[in-house]
Amino acid sequence: MSLDINQIALHQLIKRDEQNLELVLRDSLLEPTTTVVEMVAELHRVYSAKNKAYGLFNEESELAQALRLQRQGEEDFLAFSRAATGRLRDELAKYPFADGGIVLFCHYRYLAVEYLLVTVLNNLSSMRVNENLDINPTHYLDINHADIVARIDLTEWETNPQSTRYLTFLKGRVGRKVADFFMDFLGASEGLNAKAQNRGLLQAVDDFTAEAQLDKAERQNVRQQVYSYCNEQLQAGEEIELESLSKELSGVSEVSFSEFTAEKGYELEESFPADRSTLRQLTKYAGSGGGLTINFDAMLLGERIFWDPATDTLTIKGTPPNLRDQLQRRTSGGK
């Protein structure tokens, strides 16, 4: 992994009681040792694999103003991180779920792009077995379950300030207003809606195949083509490129897919991040509720699976062997 750390700072927030968070600030930057580089590489890998929301700084963002000064050389990175941690403590103190943690600021470069990663990591306790096979207590940073994370694409922010995607962050778990306080701390608002872009793409594909008057098999083949392209982009960590996708679909219609989306006003960006859960709808139908979970390949609709919209009834012809075996045993009174 071609990752180079420019500067990295570490501080701590300790929850003493329900209303107070103690601030513990380092007096020096961390040295980019092999261990530190491995930790940041793991953070980068875990964060890059997660679905993210996209945003941009508000005009009055204190963090953006301080970061701009730091980038211009008017403040050093350590001072920037110490002041920002203080602002983070003030925001966290407003919320009852505030737990504290290890606050990390890392300016690094990956594949010619500069990033600033900001995260609050939990420092957890566990056990380890030493070389004498004795069990001893140990502590570790819970990187895999980090949910208070934001990353600023410094290259994009500085070269294209009108962008709506240079800042990314993780949505908080259900029931926690993590995104709320972190957005307040960042002084940011949501920008590009990746899910909406992906939903728009799916609708455009359906309309494109309908206008081309394709039969059912041909429509499904196009959907599979779109899914294959988008999934390859997702696996490679690349965005969906509308023009590239249009080339993949050349021959489907006299009008190219990119021309079709522009003429019909789908408002799709030239490129946008792939959303795994939305793209899955290209090849599968899935849903759950009321104790029922259903998931099946789209090609089966109208062949083995039939839906009557008038009665909202789904009819399945031919059940999976393992399901059929369970049904037979239960209905015959067996266990």
From Swiss-Prot:
Keywords: Cytoplasm. The keyword Cytoplasm applies. InterPro entries: Nucleoid_associated_NdpA. Coiled coil: none annotated. Its main location: cytoplasm. It is found in: Cytoplasm, Nucleoid. One of its GO terms (cellular component) is bacterial nucleoid. It comes from the Bacteria. GO terms for molecular function: double-stranded DNA binding; single-stranded RNA binding. Belongs to the YejK family. This is Nucleoid-associated protein YejK. The gene is yejK.
